[in-house]
């Protein structure tokens, strides 16, 4: 595979920090409803998959206020470090990737959605962030393309947005300039372990020796570790995007990113196009693009931005995120195998937490 072909290049392009994990009260109800709704924010096609159902069982067990609080104690300060890491990398490496420091809007079209968004903003504020509640009128003053359906929203100033593929390509170039060897299209078959220590990798192009290995292979990390008897609570969570060119018949020109709260869809300006990205689908390890899931992105975007034209998208994509059952990234050394570390389970925060993880 190529640099940026996965979720690291196809994501919504937002550095969103300070938010609670997906594990929250009420998720069980949403999971049950998702079994029938192919156009909802969450979709789980009914099928027999014991690993998935065990993962969902554990996920629901973590849907408590106490767990959210424990996660926030870790993730809130980590988010501030992530922002600083991005600002430093972009400036020091002079990376051109459409970096916007104006934050993003979370906008709502229903009263329950607005109440929920305001409650979340209040919780985030308690951890040192500065969300701003905004009326519908002021939202439309700031962004004239917003629909009259909007009832209000939140501005999260401590966030960033960028074109993730351009960011990755620039990082790849800088790394190679510093002597890093990056092999594309290579498949890792297994790890070579001798006397409890990792000594390399077996690939489809031969063996690669190593003194240390960092396993950062997203949702595929679980399968690689499973071969050596280590279990990770991971499931692949499929996300989608549609990109629309800005112009007549296409996407409106918007100033900064926004999240359509009820639909969980991000709208991010990326130069001459706007990316509509989101959804969560648990359907296993596949890259099958379901038309109803893609249509959900467009339908949600059109409700928020009635100026979205009838021209087709310039590109469509889906990719797999590594979803941990407790909503927390899995980072650190593997106790039973010397020289082996893992960095996965970032869920929908892979872009956000990538630099600070490194």
Question: Model-derived features: where do they sit?
Answer:
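Short loop/edge segments at beta-strand edges and connector loops
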Residues: 135, 184-186, 315-317
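Helical element adjacent to the flavin cofactor pocket in flavoenzyme catalytic cores
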Residues: 115-127, 146-212
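Active-site substrate-recognition segment that forms the wall
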Residues: 11-14, 19, 23-62, 189-200, ...
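Dinucleotide-binding Rossmann-like beta1-alpha1 core, especially the glycine-rich loop
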Residues: 12-135
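Surface-exposed helix-capping loop/turn segments at secondary-structure junctions
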Residues: 88-100, 177-181, 230-231, 305-312
């Amino acid at each position: 595979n190529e640099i940026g072909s996965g979720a690291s290049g196809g994501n919504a392009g937002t550095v969103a920090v300070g938010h609670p994990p997906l594990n929250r009260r009420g998720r069980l109800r949403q999971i049950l409803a998702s079994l029938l709704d192919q156009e909802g924010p969450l979709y789980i096609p009914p099928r027999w998959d014991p690993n998935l159902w065990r993962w969902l069982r554990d996920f629901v067990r973590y849907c408590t206020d106490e767990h959210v609080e424990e996660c926030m104690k870790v993730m809130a300060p980590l988010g501030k470090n992530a922002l600083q890491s991005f600002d430093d990398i972009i400036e020091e490496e002079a990376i051109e990737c459409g970096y916007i420091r104006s934050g993003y809007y979370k906008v709502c079209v229903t009263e329950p959605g607005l109440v929920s968004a305001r409650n979340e903003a209040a919780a985030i504020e308690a951890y040192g962030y500065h969300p701003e509640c905004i009326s519908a009128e002021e939202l439309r003053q700031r962004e004239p393309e917003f629909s009259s359906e909007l009832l209000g929203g939140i501005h999260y100033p401590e966030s960033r947005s960028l074109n993730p593929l351009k960011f990755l390509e620039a990082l790849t170039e800088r790394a190679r300039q510093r002597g890093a060897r990056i092999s594309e299209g290579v498949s890792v078959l297994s790890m070579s372990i001798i006397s409890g220590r990792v000594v390399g990798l077996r690939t489809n192009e031969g063996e690669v020796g190593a003194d240390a290995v960092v396993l950062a292979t997203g949702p595929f990390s679980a399968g690689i570790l499973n071969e050596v008897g280590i279990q990770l609570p991971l499931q692949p969570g499929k996300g989608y995007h549609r990109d629309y060119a800005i112009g007549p018949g296409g996407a409106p020109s918007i100033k900064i990113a926004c999240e359509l709260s009820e639909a969980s869809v991000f709208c991010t300006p990326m130069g001459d196009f706007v990316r509509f990205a989101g959804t969560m689908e648990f359907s296993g390890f596949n890259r099958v693009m379901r038309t109803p899931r893609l249509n959900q992105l467009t339908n949600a975007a059109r409700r928020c931005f009635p100026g979205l034209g009838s021209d087709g998208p310039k590109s469509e994509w889906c990719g797999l995120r590594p979803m941990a059952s407790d909503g927390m990234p899995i980072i650190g050394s593997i106790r039973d195998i010397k020289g082996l570390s893992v960095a996965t389970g970032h869920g929908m925060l892979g872009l956000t937490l990538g630099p600070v993880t490194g």
